[in-house]
Each structure stands twice: as C-alpha cells, then as structure tokens.
A protein has these predicted regions:
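Conserved SAM/SAH cofactor-binding pocket of Class I
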Residues: 1-55
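Short beta->alpha hinge that forms the Motif I/post-I loop of the SAM-binding pocket
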Residues: 26-30, 70, 97
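A short acidic, Gly/Pro-enriched loop at the edge of an enzyme's catalytic core
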Residues: 55-65
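A short SAM/SAH-binding and catalytic strip from SAM-dependent methyltransferases
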Residues: 65-76
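A short glycine-rich, Lys/Arg-flanked "PGG" loop and its adjoining helix->strand segment in the class I
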Residues: 76-91
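ADP-ribose/adenylate-binding Rossmann-like module
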Residues: 89-102
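Conserved class I S-adenosyl-L-methionine
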Residues: 100-112
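Core SAM-dependent methyltransferase catalytic element
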Residues: 115-133
Length: 133
C-alpha cells in the first residue's frame, strides 16, 4: 500500500520490482490523476489508486507492506489506521519527516504494537522501518 501516493512513484516502483498488486490513495485529486497517468506511462496494470484519507482503510484486507512518505503530524494521526491493515509479518516504511521526529514516531508505533527495526538519516530527513509481530 502506498499511503499519500503523490505521483505514485513508490507504488509504481513496487510493481516494477515484482509486487503482485499495489493499492494506493491520496487526499488530493491531482495526485490521484497524476498517479494514474504515471501508471500508464510505466505500463503498470496491477495498481489501483483512489482518492481519500486513511479512513478509507476501514474494512480493507491486510497489506504485506505499507509505504507512507508523509509529514509527521499526518503519520501520527494515521498510524492506527495503518496498523489496522497489517498482519503478523507486515512491514511499514515511513518517510517524509525530520530526524528529530524519530522518537515521537517510534513511541507511537510501539504503543500500537509495532516492532521498530531500523532507521536511516540523510540531510536531516529520516526513514523508519517497523514490523507487526
């Protein structure tokens, strides 16, 4: 799943690297349309993109991998929705926030039952990797 897909680059990359299917969403109509255009340009047929926020995850089947490149405040608000569509062994990669946000995001994720695996930092930007046990 590509949450807040923007141009769709993360989801498209996953399909090109062998993902059987990708489901993506964004709150912005332009982003959804742009993702669809980029899917066409890249010959991607096994990806679905819809307009909406994390509330549209309610009732969805679990995903093996969740990717979310979104700012800290939205990530904090959406983490419970993300966890609700993770099964044991699902992984989640979060990005789009600053290094100083790491402790707050790790604390929130752990409080929701996720295991912190790793993080990377580059020029004050950070990425976090979690797994649901």
């Amino acid at each position: 799943m590509d949450a807040g897909c923007g141009t769709g680059v993360l989801g498209i990359f996953c399909t090109l690297k062998g993902a059987k299917s990708v489901w993506a969403y964004d709150i912005d109509r332009w982003s959804v349309d742009n993702t669809k255009e980029n899917m066409l340009l890249n010959g991607v047929k096994n990806m679905e993109v819809v307009e909406g926020n994390a509330s549209i995850l309610q009732g969805k089947d679990a995903f093996d991998l969740i990717l979310a490149n979104i700012n800290r405040n939205i990530l904090l608000a959406d983490l419970p929705s993300f966890v609700s569509v993770m099964h044991a062994g699902s992984q989640m990669i979060l990005s789009g926030f600053y290094v100083e946000d790491i402790p707050l995001l790790v604390q929130k994720a752990k409080s929701l039952g996720l295991s912190y695996l790793n993080h990377t930092e580059k020029e004050n930007w950070a990425t976090l990797l979690f797994e649901r046990l």
